[in-house]
Amino acid sequence: MDSNTVSSFQDILMRMSKMQLGSSSEDLNGMITQFESLKLYRDSLGEAVMRMGDLHSLQSRNGKWREQLSQKFEEIRWLIEEVRHRLKITENSFEQITFMQALQLLLEVEQEIRTFSFQLI
């Protein structure tokens, strides 16, 4: 994974964990969990591509990897919509910047996962 992407994930997760959004803190914790899960999935998919020939072990380890891939894209779309919603309702500039960066990162990661998945197909 690109070192900028790693630091972006870490930076956004750290910023989000410091936010206090009142009654919606439970939703924010859910977003943080989704971000962490997405990062791990993206890393494992990237490692499989790096090993090239690892498609068969990926398929045998998880026969439903295409289903899992589809689920991850649904999670990304959900996160994108959630981040856009937060961006619309927040007036705090720190939160706006954080959510704008999170949105940009999600779009980049979505593209990377698409690229990896095409290489594995």
From Swiss-Prot:
The keyword Transport applies. Disulfide bonds: none annotated. It is found in: Virion; Host nucleus. GO terms for cellular component: host cell nucleus; virion component. A motif (Nuclear export signal) lies at residues 12-21, 85-94. InterPro entries: Flu_NS2 (IPR000968). Its main location: virion. Average number present in a viral particle is estimated to be 130-200 molecules. Interacts with protein M1. May interact with host nucleoporin RAB/HRB and exportin XPO1/CRM1. Belongs to the influenza viruses NEP family. Mediates the nuclear export of encapsidated genomic RNAs (ribonucleoproteins, RNPs). Acts as an adapter between viral RNPs complexes and the nuclear export machinery of the cell. Possesses no intrinsic RNA-binding activity, but includes a C-terminal M1-binding domain. This domain is believed to allow recognition of RNPs bound to the protein M1. This is Nuclear export protein. It comes from Influenza A virus (strain A/Fowl plague virus/Rostock/8/1934 H7N1).
